[in-house]
């Protein structure tokens, strides 16, 4: 039997980050919270494990899922702002740094096409970095 894959969105919140499951036909839902993205994902994983245990204790069938984490654009930009300048991200993604600033501060939302452009640029940059070897 194939496991369902569920999208889990990671977003910046007032006190850190939150992770939540996309609308699903499941009988349960999980969330995670933390001061960092890493803490948030770890908290989500704990919540998923606790949900599985709860179902086992109550004798209810638990539908195992596979989940993938997705950033919203503003949260990604906020998380990595200390590592990348907007000018640097413009060179990597091809998206104007003024627009990136609007996305970072929530003044505008990028179109789906722009989100894909940002994601493709970041992934290409990551591939380039992972291929490097230092002498």
Predicted region positions:
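DNA-contacting interfaces and partner/effector-binding or oligomerization modules
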Residues: 1-59, 64
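Short, charged, surface-exposed hinge/linker loops at domain edges
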Residues: 2-5, 45-98, 102-115, 120, ...
């Amino acid at each position: 039997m194939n496991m369902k894959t569920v999208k889990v969105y990671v977003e910046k919140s007032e006190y850190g980050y939150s992770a939540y499951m996309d609308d699903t036909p499941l009988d349960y839902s999980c969330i995670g919270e933390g001061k960092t993205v890493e803490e948030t994902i770890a908290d989500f994983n704990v919540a998923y494990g606790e949900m599985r245990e709860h179902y086992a204790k109550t004798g209810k069938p638990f539908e195992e899922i596979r989940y993938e984490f997705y950033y919203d654009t503003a949260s990604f930009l906020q998380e990595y702002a200390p590592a990348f300048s907007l000018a640097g991200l413009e060179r990597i993604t091809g998206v104007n740094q003024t627009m990136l600033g609007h996305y970072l501060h929530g003044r505008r939302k990028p179109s789906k096409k722009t989100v894909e452009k940002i994601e493709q640029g970041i992934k290409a940059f990551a591939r380039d970095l992972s291929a490097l070897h230092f002498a």
